[in-house]
Design a protein with these regions (language model features):
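An alpha-helical, amphipathic repeat domain used for nucleic-acid recognition
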Residues: 1-268
Length: 268
């Protein structure tokens, strides 16, 4: 309650709660962090100005925000931009965010340069990302261009990553015709962030499929597609849609035509 003589509020009661301290000024109550309470050396009967109250609350707010930030960083690494976004979402003020980021950087808990290097190494080793994808992801995480320019991507390491990705996709795309397999492989490796030279290197190493197996797949796909389109089309329209659909799936035009010729011969 404010003193009539000084205009200051007098602390009438102090109550400790789990993780916080409640300080009473008559009917008025404020809640402070343990650190804020200790920092301002509060006790019953002490007179406090309104400006001092504001400082206590700001200190306490920053204390809570700092603990929140440490909790986040204890679970995983963040870039400075990502951490700022988390603090904003948690309601931290601009001043609190600025001070917290400064403190975390001073204590080595927040280091964009170290983050970028670690991310680049792990993304290439574990996720099989190429240089372009890694730089793209780091830019989205707010890493400064000067830091990105310092990163080094050993060619041998990137080639090894591309090989692991290539082998994974070979298994995934095994049921497709070779041409479709090449299209999918090119797109997949491009999305992983590998450059054109590496992509072409692996495209050339896609093995030819078993001819008998490839033909069997085409014939089955031909019958399936024909059955679907024949419900709506016939004659030339059916033929055109059959060819377009099968070529889109990666089957060669001349092999499709050969099956059509066989079918026409059998029907004559």
């Amino acid at each position: 309650m404010p003193s009539r003589k000084t205009g200051k509020s007098i602390i009438t009661k102090i109550q400790k709660k789990p993780g916080k301290i409640q300080v009473y000024f008559g009917k008025e109550k404020i809640e402070l962090s343990l650190n804020a309470f200790t920092e301002f050396r509060l006790f019953e009967g002490k007179e406090v100005t309104q400006a001092e109250k504001s400082k206590m609350l700001s200190y306490s707010e920053m204390d809570a925000d700092y603990a929140y930030a440490l909790g986040l960083l204890g679970r995983k690494a963040y870039t400075e931009m990502e951490l700022r976004q988390k603090l904003i979402a948690n309601g931290a003020s601009e001043e609190s965010r600025r001070k917290i980021v400064k403190l975390l950087k001073q204590h080595g808990y927040l280091d964009d340069e170290e983050y970028a290097q670690t991310y680049a190494e792990e993304a290439m080793e574990i996720k099989c990302y190429g240089r372009k994808r890694i730089l793209y992801e780091l830019q989205n995480k707010g890493i400064d261009e000067k830091i990105l320019q310092k990163l080094r991507f050993p060619q041998e390491k990137e080639k090894e990553a591309s090989e692991r990705a290539f082998k994974t996709y070979l298994v995934r795309f095994h049921s497709f015709p070779k041409r479709k397999k090449q299209e999918k492989m090119r797109r997949a490796l491009y999305e992983r962030g590998f450059d054109e030279e590496l992509i072409n290197y692996w495209i050339q190493r896609i093995p030819d499929g078993d001819p008998a197996l490839e033909e069997d797949r085409l014939r089955k796909e031909y019958e399936k597609t024909k059955l679907s389109y024949s419900r709506k089309y016939e004659g030339r329209a059916l033929k055109e849609r059959l060819i377009a659909s099968l070529m889109k799936k990666g089957y060669p035009y001349d092999e499709i035509k050969e099956i059509m010729e066989e079918e026409r011969y059998e029907n004559d």
